[in-house]
């Protein structure tokens, strides 16, 4: 006798149903960061008991909730967007990954702080975070979305690494593409830049080449390191080092190819992709 497993596919998330499926989503979208004193804030959450106070506060930041086509349809707290229970039901939000290279074409890596709620102590690219559901960082069309992501990247490079805006001006950021990933963390928290049935990504990949001064925020970053492509490949072979899943995905699928053309006109052919890469 043959048994058939039943697979439940999450409904397609749209502007019309997102508030019904996820009551924590605010469909007004453009709003200020939730203050930590509001009812239902992350500091009052049982799921976050025992975590670092500052990292818990940051879970009240407002992420941009998207439909399958990377169009903003609402906003929700970082906590709501990173709960695997919501991710598994298809809650989608926008993210970015910055790859900063110095004048010697070395990539700046960071090791995430032990205090981080998701992926603590793992090595990753220079900066990875989320544009917020606030004026200036939210965009519906691709050009506006890219500008919003660049502004968010500039903000987070300062907040995490102490890199001042004048050293990373918006016009120096280069947008390459968007990718999909779903990266479980510890079963409760994760990253999901798609819905499971269509695999539409919203992780915006940015390059910037600049020599910068670092003033690392120890609550965000445990360590930093500049590496060549060969040195990074050697790091990947060391069993004692752990890397964020999206970083290894980007490296193995596209980064090393792009990196080989850094500083040449040949790199231009990879920039500004309109299509979303489904990984």
Swiss-Prot record:
PROSITE patterns: NUDIX
Gene Ontology molecular function, alphabetical: isopentenyl-diphosphate delta-isomerase activity; metal ion binding
Keywords: Isomerase, Isoprene biosynthesis, Lipid biosynthesis, Lipid metabolism, Magnesium, Metal-binding, Steroid biosynthesis, Steroid metabolism, Sterol biosynthesis, Sterol metabolism
Annotated Mg(2+) binding sites: 82, 93, 191, 193
Residues in Nudix hydrolase domain copies: 91-249
Cofactor binding description: Binds 1 Mg(2+) ion per subunit.
Domain of life according to the entry: Eukaryota
Catalytic activity: isopentenyl diphosphate = dimethylallyl diphosphate
One Gene Ontology CC term in the entry: cytoplasm
Residues that hold substrate according to the record: 78, 111, 116, 129
Pathway(s) per entry: Isoprenoid biosynthesis; dimethylallyl diphosphate biosynthesis; dimethylallyl diphosphate from isopentenyl diphosphate: step 1/1
Record-linked Pfam families: NUDIX
Biological role: Isopentenyl-diphosphate delta-isomerase; part of the second module of ergosterol biosynthesis pathway that includes the middle steps of the pathway. Idi1 catalyzes the 1,3-allylic rearrangement of isopentenyl (IPP) to its highly electrophilic allylic isomer, dimethylallyl diphosphate (DMAPP). The second module is carried out in the vacuole and involves the formation of farnesyl diphosphate, which is also an important intermediate in the biosynthesis of ubiquinone, dolichol, heme and prenylated proteins.
Family: Belongs to the IPP isomerase type 1 family.
Protein name per its UniProtKB record: Isopentenyl-diphosphate delta-isomerase idi1
């Amino acid at each position: 006798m043959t048994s058939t497993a039943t697979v439940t596919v999450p409904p397609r998330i749209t502007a019309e149903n997102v508030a019904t499926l996820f009551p924590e989503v605010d469909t007004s979208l453009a709003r200020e960061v939730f203050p930590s004193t509001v009812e239902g804030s992350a500091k009052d959450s049982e799921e976050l008991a025992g975590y670092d106070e500052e990292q818990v506060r940051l879970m009240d930041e407002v992420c941009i909730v998207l439909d399958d086509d990377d169009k903003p349809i609402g906003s929700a707290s970082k906590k709501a967007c990173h709960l695997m229970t919501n991710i598994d039901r298809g809650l989608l939000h926008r993210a970015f990954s910055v790859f900063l290279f110095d004048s010697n074409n070395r990539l700046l890596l960071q090791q995430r702080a032990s205090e981080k709620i998701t992926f603590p102590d793992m090595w990753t690219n220079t900066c990875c975070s989320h544009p917020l559901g606030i004026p200036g960082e939210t965009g519906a069309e691709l050009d506006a979305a890219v500008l919003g992501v660049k502004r968010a990247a500039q903000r987070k490079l300062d907040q995490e690494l102490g890199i001042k805006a004048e050293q990373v001006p918006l016009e120096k950021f280069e947008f390459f593409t968007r990718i999909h990933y779903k990266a479980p963390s510890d079963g409760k928290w994760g990253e999901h830049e798609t819905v499971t049935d269509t695999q539409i990504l919203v992780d915006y990949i940015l390059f910037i080449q600049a020599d910068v001064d670092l003033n690392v925020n120890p609550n965000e970053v445990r360590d930093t390191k500049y590496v060549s492509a060969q040195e990074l490949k050697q790091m990947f072979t060391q069993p004692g080092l752990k890397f964020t899943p999206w970083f290894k995905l980007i490296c193995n699928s596209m980064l090393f190819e792009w990196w080989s053309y850094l500083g040449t006109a040949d790199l231009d052919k990879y920039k500004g992709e309109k299509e979303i890469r489904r990984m």
